[in-house]
Amino acid sequence: MPHSWDYDAVVIGSGPGGEGAAMGLVKQGARVAVIERYHNVGGGCTHWGTIPSKALRHAVSRIIEFNHNPLYSDHSRLLRSSFADILNHADNVINQQTRMRQGFYERNHCEILQGNAHFIDEHTLALECHDGTVETLTAEKFVIACGSRPYHPNDVDFSHPRIYDSDSILSLHHEPRHVIIYGAGVIGCEYASIFRGMDVKVDLINTRDRLLAFLDQEMSDSLSYHFWNSGVVIRHNEEYEKIEGCDDGVIMHLKSGKKLKADCLLYANGRTGNTDSLALENIGLETDSRGQLKVNSMYQTALPHVYAVGDVIGYPSLASAAYDQGRIAAQALVKGEATAHLIEDIPTGIYTIPEISSVGKTEQQLTAMKVPYEVGRAQFKHLARAQIVGMNVGTLKILFHRETKEILGIHCFGERAAEIIHIGQAIMEQKGGGNTIEYFVNTTFNYPTMAEAYRVAALNGLNRLF
């Protein structure tokens, strides 16, 4: 006789991974509950990560545009805005996103349970509700999509009012004139752009020898130059020895002997999976040192009926990929296998000012692989559309095989890079000879557009062949 479960599946977390899994499951007729520890759905992506930081970036970039465009300003008076002012814009976007995503669950009759969950056994969860009561619920299968949080080393006092992580920085209530950002990964670089755009002095501490080393070096160098040109001080190959919180700021002692003082510190060096409260030891699952779970190609953990998606499984730790992982896991959970899979070349969008976006191989990778490739480039300053809107800083680079003309990688630096990249990605994904740089020469683009950069870059690259 089949077992009677409360639900066919329970999804822990309502971020992109949890939402993708939940929507995929209910569309296939499963009885699903989603557990969310906070009062609103959306997870860290909506409330502390992707959405608010990109909303902040947009507001700051518009201020920069106003102050530098003679159409709006004669430079005699600069537009300034407080951090609290631009946070209001982020709050409005968060509220819109929350209402929209809440509607997804309601329309699809997917139950939302609020509280903190942990495993009692392999098919039972305890749910600690916000009113203090504890409920138990059973399910045949589970999807862990509880996301991640900023990594907190034990020797940094995050309770100090001038020491922030990438979550708490959204509660900044004073106006810093100088900020230290420790960690020059994606989050650190994005916030360096935001603060410098607000005319705040920025010391960016990088524990490696160059910014965002996973990028094509030309893109990384472009960002480094742009930071230097805007006044960001980058300190490479540095690690902190000690961090002191003071009444009026923070002092950072570096292992190299240097000392830095600023009004506040943003610690942005790594993230940890939110698995420590799930009591995974009760079901025999283990995580790595960063709280992340190992999964197979169908996102199953060591327990076949327990799946995991999103930041909690590590790379690529992208909201876009997490949603697809959830959708694929839902298909595998219901049907026993998944016909869908993540694409091999996942685009990366980095929302610095200007943006950076990449898909496919870098020049360094192709050189190491001994692939005979050529490069086609288009400078934004030569495009009519860029001249019209004042977006002269930027470049599009296409890497393609010299013999087959197959596109191997696309890299873009400049405003709207994260949008522009998808044109090339669509061609890269074509099968049966459809992936060719000659497409951009043989098609007709609207004029004037930023998309025209592809035709310019394609012609530039093809003209290099002999």
Curated annotation (Swiss-Prot):
InterPro entries listed in its UniProt record: Class-I_Pyr_Nuc-Dis_Oxidored, FAD/NAD-bd_sf, FAD/NAD-binding_dom, FAD/NAD-linked_Rdtase_dimer_sf, Pyr_nuc-diS_OxRdtase, Pyr_nucl-diS_OxRdtase_dimer, STH_gammaproteobact
- What's the record's note on cofactor binding? Binds 1 FAD per subunit.
Q: Does the keyword NAD apply?
A: yes
Which GO BP terms apply? 2-oxoglutarate metabolic process; NADP metabolic process
Q: Which domain of life is it from?
A: Bacteria
Q: Where in the cell is it found?
A: Cytoplasm
E.C. designation(s): 1.6.1.1
Instruction: Specify which residues bind FAD according to the UniProt entry for this protein.
Output: E36, R37, Y38, H39, N40, V41, G42, G43, G44, C45
* GO MF annotation terms: dihydrolipoyl dehydrogenase (NADH) activity; flavin adenine dinucleotide binding; NAD(P)+ transhydrogenase (Si-specific) activity
Enzyme class, UniProt record, top EC level = oxidoreductase
Range of residues in the leader sequence: none
Q: Which cofactor does it need?
A: FAD
Q: Would the keyword Metal-binding turn up in this protein's UniProt record?
A: no
Keywords on record: Cytoplasm, FAD, Flavoprotein, NAD, NADP, Oxidoreductase
Instruction: Give the record's GO CC terms.
Output: cytosol
Reaction(s) catalysed by this chain's protein: NAD(+) + NADPH = NADH + NADP(+)
Protein family (similarity comment): Belongs to the class-I pyridine nucleotide-disulfide oxidoreductase family.
NCBIfam families (UniProt xref): PRK05249.1
Q: What does this protein do?
A: Conversion of NADPH, generated by peripheral catabolic pathways, to NADH, which can enter the respiratory chain for energy generation.
| Protein name in the entry | Soluble pyridine nucleotide transhydrogenase
